[in-house]
Amino acid sequence: MDALEQKYQRLQEILTQFGRVAVAFSGGVDSTFLLYAAQDTLGGNALAVTAVTAALPQRERQGAEALCAQLGVRRLVYPLDVLTLPAFQTNPPDRCYHCKRALFQGMLTLAQEAGFPTLVDGSNVDDTGDYRPGMRALAELGIQSPLLAAGLTKADIRALSHRFHLPTWDQPSAACLASRIPYGEAITGEKLALVEQAEQFLAGLGLTQLRVRLHGGNLARIEVPPEQLEVVLTHRTGIVQTLTGLGCAYVTVDLAGYQMGSLNKVL
């Protein structure tokens, strides 16, 4: 048994202790792997719960639905209008805490009403190294993080996902659309829609790991891996036309490249 198999076995032991679990499922790399493991371990005692908000891109909503159908797991949906939450809309540095608290409280209640007392999420070892106030909300609500408890890193999760033929094994890391707007700048539905449409257009050019950070509501700062900067320059005219058409007065490219949580630098 190799190291990955040992970690997966440990994950199954943890899930078995819960008996019945609901997985907070977004359709991303981590939650898809966790949902697969929960079903593999618990069968019908695994449930998926997806939170739907304006900060979740439409393609991810559709992807989550399709993955549940593929895995044969029952799914519940918890809708939340996050733009009605003052602590989300005003975008303070601890925005993620308030949003996660509301989302996971709702998903936990929904799961418990369906007979699943434990809600688990896809946090892993790598998530402990960045500024993540949302993890405090999970701890307060008693949300369990079995991937973290089993010592699984992002690389482990991708490797095991590939081993189990999960289509998300090489999917780019995702984050809610609100993470594209600098702290202190109000979040609106219009800004979230602009970012989503801009990123969808750029993804259509073949760019993979990318972010469109929206500064001041009208300056787009595009982040892509350095090796993909040439693609951006090749399509420069079309990118400028499209993003200005969406409402951006200025279209820029960050020469530092894609950086996870780059807006946390100012904290």
Language model segments and positions:
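ATP-dependent adenylation/nucleotidyltransferase module used to activate substrates
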Residues: 1-163, 204, 220, 238-248, ...
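Short, aliphatic-rich beta-strand segments
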Residues: 47, 212, 218-225
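Short, structured loop/turn "capping" segments at alpha-beta junctions
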Residues: 153-159, 166-175, 208-210
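Internal, active-site/partner-interface "lid" segment
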Residues: 171-191
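Short glycine/threonine-rich loop-to-helix capping motif typified by GTGT followed
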Residues: 186-192, 226-230, 263-267
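Short amphipathic alpha-helix segments
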Residues: 189-209
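C-terminal boundary motif of the adenylate-forming
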Residues: 208-214, 254
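Short, conserved charged micro-motifs
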Residues: 228-238
